[in-house]
Amino acid sequence: QADFDHSRRHIRPHLDLDQSYTSSEYWVYSKELSYNPAMWTFAHLSYNYTTPGSGSDYIEFLEGFKKAKTIAESEQSHEIYKIVSGSNPDTWVWAYPMEKMEDMSSTASLGGGGEFLQDALGKAEADRINDIYQKVTKSRMRQVIKFRPELSTSIGNDEN
């Protein structure tokens, strides 16, 4: 209930609601599946719409992808969020931090991983991880957003 109250007080007043918008989506941040989180001015968001019931498979893909980035000591960070309510509850969101639009080129080709996974994990494991991604991901949508700190509230500083 506290999440809904917080949303009603602090988030919904800032949303542009049209006639087709009927509910909020709630995202849960996954520290365990994110890699080297960083503050950002802009973010390239990649919404991965997965097949219902494939959550554990997609988590296995995410763990493999993070492992490959760790082995490769990648400089490209990402944050993982799971949409847990609303019209698309089987959606995972990747947030790649950017300072300028040109930074998007470093995140645009990551998809299922390709050569990046193979170099870090070997061909057999990269193929296995990529097969999981191809099997459970129905579609993907991308978006660029700007961070709006004035619309954020700090944890523990919620006013009643």
Model-derived segments and spans:
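Short S/T/G/P-rich N-terminal loop/turn motif that feeds into the first structured element of a domain
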Residues: 1-160
